[in-house]
Amino acid sequence: ILKFALSEKNIVTATKYLKVLPVIKKLIVYLNIPAPSEERGAALWHKDDFGYKSLDLFLAVSDININSGPLYYLKAKKELGVFLKIKNIIKNALPGERNKVTLESFSNYFDKDKIGALIGKSGTGVFIDSFTTYHRGGYCKSENRIMLRISYQTPDTKRGQQPYNQQEFAYYPKIKKKDIKNIFHRYILFKDRNKFLQFIKIDKIILSFIKIFHYKL
């Protein structure tokens, strides 16, 4: 998985989109199982509020159909990007539902033909910007879903800034910084903000700026 995440094609794709050499802030394989309840949490419409720009690869490990919790995403490109927000979010939200939008509310803003779905055989994938694109997924009706997610981001984002051993790769501690000889791979896996940017809490400054200029539908 790590070799695939560091593949030249993926890194070049992320670099072209982000305009800088990316860092990997999320590398995870999801296993979702059928749920008796209605959609909640990440199965509701949302954006990931961690920064200004991201490029996330979602890749089907198992075959995915309508019954196994496909990823849904807004295909329509919005010029306002991260600044666009739907104001009709869930009130008195339960844990995991903060800033989420119900399926019913979302349908009042965007037609079905504006929504894409990651459905297909194992190996089918899609790149989306999870910071600027509304998306949801993981609600399995009757079948399991296994999906790989890789988030390529810039070092100034909030995601991945929690304390951890910086000499080990957070998602697979057997990967040691000292063992990575390729300087680009070392940057991608272990790069953190410099101490000055950490001191001024640049991620909070960026997020506050974005919230000030939100355009709410």
Predicted segments, located by residue:
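N-terminal auxiliary "cap/dimerization" subdomain that precedes the catalytic jelly-roll/cupin core
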Residues: 1-23, 117-121, 195-217
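Short histidine-centered beta-strand/loop micro-motifs
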Residues: 41-48, 118-119, 136-140
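Double-stranded beta-helix
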Residues: 67-133
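Short catalytic/ligand-binding loop motif for oxyanion handling, primarily in non-cytosolic enzymes
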Residues: 37, 66-67, 81-82, 135-137, ...
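Non-heme Fe(II)/2-oxoglutarate
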Residues: 87-88, 125, 131-217
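Conserved double-stranded beta-helix
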Residues: 9-80
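Conserved hydrophobic/aromatic beta-strand scaffold that supports enzyme active sites
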Residues: 44, 56-60, 115-117, 125-127, ...
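Short, surface-exposed loop/helix-turn segments at secondary-structure junctions
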Residues: 41-45, 100-111, 163-167
